[in-house]
A protein has these predicted regions:
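Conserved catalytic or regulatory cores that recognize and/or transform ribose-phosphate-containing ligands
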Residues: 1-170
């Protein structure tokens, strides 16, 4: 069973989301499409087997992370997501179209933990060979960890297909 952590920016502004509309607003988020159920990606759990590939367990990130007393929401999110990366085998990083400073940080953390990392980029936005906002961290991560793959895609559906077809890490 491959334990997968997904990292990427939500495409709905956080200030628009509340407990009454969270499931509706995030139902089209790529996490929901990968897992096959919006609720399983919103509320923190120990992991859920994805609908279209019984060989993959989604272990994070979640919209609502577990909250520890004494920590701010932001401190808690960082703490919980680093724990999720610690227990995963694979980090899927979505660097298409949206600025994702947290994703860059999670990729770097995963690289130091020697995790398998697959970074998906839009060729029109990011060219790590020449220009684009992500070239430096992508090259750095590739130099730190031999288990990093960069895949240029035209559509986020390709990320879903990749996860649905995962059999083993290599």
């Amino acid at each position: 069973m491959i334990k997968m952590f997904y990292s990427g920016t939500y495409k709905v502004r956080h200030e628009l989301i509340n407990k009454d509309n969270v499931l509706e607003l995030l139902k089209d988020d790529i996490r929901s499409k990968i897992v096959g159920n919006v609720k399983d990606t919103v509320y923190s759990s120990d992991g859920v087997i994805i609908k279209n590939n019984k060989n993959v367990m989604y272990v994070g990130g979640f919209y609502y992370e577990k909250q520890e007393i004494g920590k701010s929401i932001c401190e808690n999110v960082v703490s919980e997501e680093l724990k999720q990366i610690d227990k995963c085998d694979l980090v899927i990083a979505n660097l298409t179209k949206y600025s994702a400073i947290a994703t860059i940080t999670e990729i770097m953390y995963a690289a130091f933990k020697n995790k398998y990392i697959v970074i998906f980029c839009d060729p029109n936005v990011t060219s790590y060979n020449v220009e684009g906002e992500y070239w430096f961290p992508i090259i750095t991560v590739k130099q730190l960890n031999k288990n990093v793959k960069v895949i240029f895609i035209e559509d986020e559906k390709e990320i879903i297909e990749y996860v649905n077809n995962l059999k083993e890490l290599k």
